[in-house]
Amino acid sequence: MKRILFIVLFAIVSLNAFSQDVIKFLGIPIEGNKKEMISKLCEKGYEYDSESDLLSGEFNGIDVFISVQTVNNRVWRIAIVDENQNSDETNIKIRFNKLFDQLSNNSKYELADGSKLEDSEDISYEMVVHKKRYDASFTFKDKSIHGLVWYMIAEQYGRYGILMFYENLDNAANGDDL
């Protein structure tokens, strides 16, 4: 009897050790199909426009568009883009650094790559002349979550905005289609 109990207990512990949690966006697991994800985001108050295939609403205090991106009809990434990319260089640096601090100070995440921007950084010059990309990426402290949260500065006609991504790396393209 002890032996059977030990085997059952060992099997349960082994399964738990290999189970993986899924990255979430607004508490919604990034998995399943696109229609389900859009429906769940609409339940959170976002509005879906079928013509543009985008949702709109507020995220982290900013009006944004949200794109649900799939691979083989499985959701793998949520892309968030500022609705109005109208920040000047000073304000986008402040916003970039604020996001960096928010993610760095969140107990769920750890920095994978990137750093805060210095006040003296001339992002306009660096982006145009040297094609520099300003981004930061964070992984999960809980290693059972195979996901990535990252963001970058986007420039359009001298105005700036933030592009942010929540990625379920288990659902990302892995070359199976090649």
Give the residues covered by each predicted segment.
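Small side chains
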Residues: A11-S14, G57, G147
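N-terminal, post-signal-peptide region of Sec/Tat-exported proteins
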Residues: L41-V81
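Non-cytosolic coordination micro-motifs
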Residues: Q20-D53, E83-L178
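A signal for specific C-terminal beta-sheet/loop modules enriched in small/flexible residues
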Residues: I7-F10, F65-I78, T90-F100
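Sec-dependent N-terminal signal peptides
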Residues: I4-A17
